[in-house]
Design a protein with these regions (language model features):
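Generic hydrophobic/aromatic pocket-lining and core-packing "Φ" positions
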Residues: 16, 56, 94-95, 115, ...
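ADP-ribose/adenylate-binding Rossmann-like module
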Residues: 1-30, 163-221
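Flexible, glycine/proline-enriched loop segments at strand-loop-helix junctions
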Residues: 2-6, 38-50, 85, 101-105
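Generic secondary-structure signature for well-ordered alpha-helical cores
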Residues: 21-25, 60-68, 100-104, 119-126, ...
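Adenosine-phosphate binding glycine-rich loop
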Residues: 30-73, 198, 204-289
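Electropositive phosphate-/nucleotide-binding environments in soluble metabolic enzymes
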Residues: 9-13, 46-53, 92, 108, ...
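Short, acidic/turn-prone active-site loops that include or flank metal/cofactor-
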Residues: 8-11, 31-33, 111, 130-133, ...
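Glycine-rich phosphate/diphosphate-binding loop of Rossmann-like nucleotide-binding domains
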Residues: 66-159
Length: 289
């Protein structure tokens, strides 16, 4: 038996253990390597794009303010100020969508290499002086000093924003806490936080994962499974990712797995009674450091 899909092995080690015991060959789509050849298979990116777009729409829908600038007989209305934290695929899509809606957008990411991408979308990049590029295009965890420096700079931008969208997540680890309770206390009346990192615990200290509620005068929403809210296109994109993964390994109607291929090697979770992904193996066998 072969299983392909999002496995979340760090969340469900017992599931991985069961697949190992039953000698199931499994491939985790979230383990697809970030290399040029595998871009069409990158389901994390395709679903993140859906989530980022939807986050901006949710922020605009729940905000008590217009996003674009309006000039009316009743006077001029200034555009909303939107802050996007995390400039990965989800963050960049949130920036682009908020800009299309007419908002003034600022963005921040610990990976300084994202500055050019942020500015190309018409947003202002916030430079905190902290750079934390990690492996595989992801951000690494910050030191305590880096966290302090980051929060000092971000605090003033957060309190001036009408909407904040957070997308900062580290695969297999809890989401970093970027927005403190004190920052939320100082936010504008009627402002909103959309926390896309809620499934990992959230980027905001007062996020209740899976819930939407008012914290004082600020609306906090930490949704789960955001891509399912745009099910048609999310499914189309995911199906294409799966097709692109399967096409190279199917010959004459049979599955031919080349374990020397980086995509196959890196995305394999279990095979032939073994856990092939080392961090997951360490977690399941109880010797994770």
């Amino acid at each position: 038996t072969i299983v392909i899909g999002f496995m979340s092995p760090h969340k469900y080690p017992e599931r991985v253990k069961l697949m190992r015991e039953r000698r199931i060959t499994s491939f985790a789509m979230e383990l697809i390597p970030r290399i040029s050849r595998a871009q069409g298979m990158d389901a994390l990116s395709s679903q993140a794009a859906v989530a980022g777009y939807k986050a901006a729409i949710m922020a605009a829908d729940r905000s008590g303010r217009f996003f674009p600038m309006l000039t009316t007989a009743a006077g001029t209305i200034r555009p909303a100020k939107v802050l996007v934290i995390g400039a990965g695929v989800a963050g960049l899509q949130a920036i682009a969508t908020a800009r299309r809606l007419g908002a003034v957008v600022e963005a921040y990411d610990v990976r300084s290499a994202t500055r050019e991408q942020v500015e190309s979308l018409g947003a202002k990049y916030i430079d905190t002086g902290v750079a934390a590029e990690g492996e595989g295009g992801y951000a690494r965890e910050l030191t305590e000093e880096e966290k302090r420096k980051q929060l000092e700079v971000l605090a003033s931008h957060i309190t001036r924003s009408d909407a904040v969208i957070t997308t900062a997540a580290i695969p297999g680890k809890p989401s970093p806490k970027i927005i403190s309770t004190e920052m939320v206390d100082n936010m504008k009346v009627g402002s909103i936080i959309i926390d896309l990192a809620a499934e990992g615990g959230g980027n905001c200290e007062v996020t209740r994962p899976g819930e939407e509620y008012d914290y004082g005068s600020v609306r906090i929403y930490g949704p789960f499974n955001v891509p399912s809210m745009l099910a048609v296109h999310a499914s189309d994109m995911y199906a294409k990712n799966l097709l692109n993964f399967l096409t190279p390994v199917i010959e004459e109607g049979e599955l031919k797995l080349d374990w020397e291929d980086q995509v196959i090697h890196d995305s394999a979770l279990t095979h032939d009674g073994e856990i092939r992904h080392e961090p997951t193996r360490a977690l399941v066998e109880g010797d994770a450091s």
